């Protein structure tokens, strides 16, 4: 039986607020983000075709300017180990030694990857992780609840996870998701 009251819960589990950003959101007013009190930003670094997100440079620079701790994510379209290694190398190249306070998140949600099976996804994720950590960056896996429960194998659950849990009720905010590290 859980006997936590609200105050105990808040004391035990620190709430942090963050956003994930890509070119889909357009040009962000980072001063407003900082004034709103965001604790972190996770920026998309590359998009389909291994092309650098057109707003990555600006977003990274503005996060540093406003002291917003930063991480990056790579939505993977890879279907082979060679492809995911290429994606990882592109991430490292695009980062070019930049400092990150949060991990490089491998975004595993591409529906075509499901057909590869859990074991192949496991091998691909570890191939990506080796390149990222060899470059000195922290690594984690981003996915939605469905992928975490039904696609990700237990071998990968040793890594940090950022799990998207999209809000069911519209509170007037758009493109809002709650991420938790498991």
Where are the regions a protein language model picked out?
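Surface-exposed substrate-engagement region within the catalytic domains
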Residues: 89-104, 111-182
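Acidic (Asp/Glu)-rich catalytic clusters
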Residues: 28-37, 55-68, 91-100, 175-177
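Boundary/entry segment of secreted carbohydrate-active catalytic domains
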Residues: 2-46
